[in-house]
Amino acid sequence: MNKWKVRRAPAGVQRQEDHREEYERDRARVIHSSAFRRLQAKTQILGVLEGDFHRTRLTHSMEVAQIGRGLVLNLQKKFPELNDLLPRLEQIETTGLAHDLGHPPFGHGGETALNCAMADYGGFEGNGQTLRILTLLESHSPENGLDLTRRTLLGVLKYPVPYANLCKTSSPDATDKSAKLNFQQTWQPPKCFLDTEQEVFNWIVAPLSNTDQLHFCEYTRPTTQSHG
């Protein structure tokens, strides 16, 4: 099997009678997941003078999936000689549908508050939580979450560096009044995956050469005042 279509669960655990294409199965698993349904209760943007219905994370994710599909169709028409390098339509749609699953209510303010609350337990970051939901927390499989294909997980993985490597080196003091006044700036997390998903990340990038992995994971080192 194509190394990018492999799943983490042993082959014996997977349904042998399911004849759908691998990325079609990924798409179905995301759409039927609890995490995807929860997006309807999370506001994406409070649009002024746009009517009574605000854009939610769910409608935003559907729009992202549609735009991604349109981009691939456009590239297929313009560069037919590169079609073998382009993602399948189902795969790019799945990436769009799943990309915000880990983001909490109240946008980046909610993310910052959770990072503060979880400071002693590895912190919190919405994109990292997305990977955790997809690979562990969702209930499709006992140990692998939705057990999506490697390529789909790579597409969802936005920031290929763990939290600990990027977090600024000075820890905020929760009793510091200035830290409370500048809460968003003080506790905003780095863009990363969570340290707990290091093993999952290693599996995702395993097909890449050592050189490609080094280039893929390059980052600016953090300072006492700013994240990497």
What is each model feature region?
Residues K42-D52:
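A short small-residue
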